[in-house]
Amino acid sequence: MSRVIFHIDVNSAFLSWSAVKRVMEGGQDLRLVPSVVSGDPGDRRSIISAASMPAKKLGIRAAMPVTMALRICPQLVIVPGDWAWYKRCSEEFIAICRSYSPVLQQFSIDECFIDMSLRCGKRDPVEIATRLKDEIKSRLGFTVNVGVGPNKLLAKMASDFEKPDKVHTLWESEIPSKMWPLGVRDLLWVGKKTEERLIAYGIHTIGDLARLSVGQLTRLVGQKFAAQLHGNANGRDDSPVETEVQEAKSYSAERTFPKDLVDPKDIDRALFNVACIVAHRIRRDDFRASTVSMFVKYKDFSVAQRQTSLDQPTDVTALILNAARRMLAEVWDGVTPLRQVGLGVSKLTHESVLQMSLFEDPKMEYYRDWDRQYDAERARTEDARLLAYERKPNAAGAPATPESTGIPASPGSTAVPVAPAPQSSEPTYVVLREVTAPSESGPLVFRYPDGEKALAAVKMAVRSDPSLRFHRVNLPDGSYSFDLLRDGKVIERHVAHV
């Protein structure tokens, strides 16, 4: 039996949902006038998270600064976001979709996939999709697009065709006429950097991409991504619509910031922290993950997310973190304030069924040793705040990151190398033994079983931050320490017990 997949996407979700609420309260319909949703209408530095169709026709779009939009349209109506209301609208939207098929995968707050293979049978999928679209409009007051296809990829591509309030199909026979003429950026998972690289080689449309061989693509984007791109450009996607039960077979962590962050080193630190937590959990349960996903929530509560497949299942923090960093570069411009960052792993394989690779990068043992030290510290220390990589930002020192210790992208990867993490002006260190929290006036203290590890840690810190200096101090009990100094003040003490 051939598959029939629907992708349902709310048209300009935040704007539509705000409009519905205004109409219910007797106000104007924001969808009929140039209007936008912004995090703080009174702050002209804020960005737009959603725009009405009249606003889009003027050139106003999501992610545009409010100041720029007001120059285009001084009469622009600007309304604040309402997250509680959006959540309620999303839940009601998903409930209607689930009534058509229990095999539902929520892809984001305003879109989902449903597997209609059994429900459709010999019935016309377009007729059912139209009924679903119209039911959402009549019951909830907002419009959606429904894409219909034989897999998730083609269904999602179809839903992005002409909007709003439309049903579109994209069957395999329609790929040459409907999908191949589109620009490469319109293909799912193709970001700005990949688009620029492809265009530089004369690949402008999805059809251009589809006509290349995997070997030709490998020379441009690497072997793993080449196979995925080639498959997507030709409409191939065997991934199932994953229900909530399957989704539970994953691990994730997120961090909401006390205040919106824009400093790349602070955001990188947060991403590092959640990567450590997630990787620790899958190691604890003897799993390895093949898929890494991440999301960021902007100041105005809009969300961007990405997902990628790894070369092989892993539980190594460094590989998970590097994948997350590559995705972060796709969704964040480096200047827009972020409210939250999250990371997850899925497609898990139990360690007992995996075979050890005989061709693993020799450096992997170093990365695994780093993870073992992290796991040991978490197991021995009940108060996680005493762990260096869990300390608050105002503590004495910033956490070490795998990038600052020289951890590269996944072994054997031919993907574009990951740029080094932003260097903090604070000291960087690695926990190798015991940690003692600093007093109000004293430094953070680390204790090691031997001097070699203590010296290696301080050298790593100095390499990461040239403003640091260190010297050796003999202690009364016969041990000695390497003290890290900034501007003549001791900020960390690395004690070697002999």
Regions found by a protein language model. Give the residues of each.
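Short beta-strand
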Residues: 104-108, 286-287, 472
